[in-house]
Swiss-Prot record:
The lineage of its organism: Eukaryota, Metazoa, Chordata, Craniata, Vertebrata. Pfam families: Antimicrobial_1. Keywords: Amphibian defense peptide, Antibiotic, Antimicrobial, Cytolysis, Disulfide bond, Fungicide, Hemolysis, Secreted. This is Brevinin-1JDb. Its main location: secreted.
Length: 24
């Protein structure tokens, strides 16, 4: 994987999880 992809995923995944779980 590209470092850029990992950085984006590291930022997007927690945000999506936060939005779904409603535990921001």
């Amino acid at each position: 994987f590209l470092p850029a992809v990992l950085r984006v995923a590291a930022q997007v995944v927690p945000t999506v999880f936060c939005a779904i779980s409603k535990k921001c």
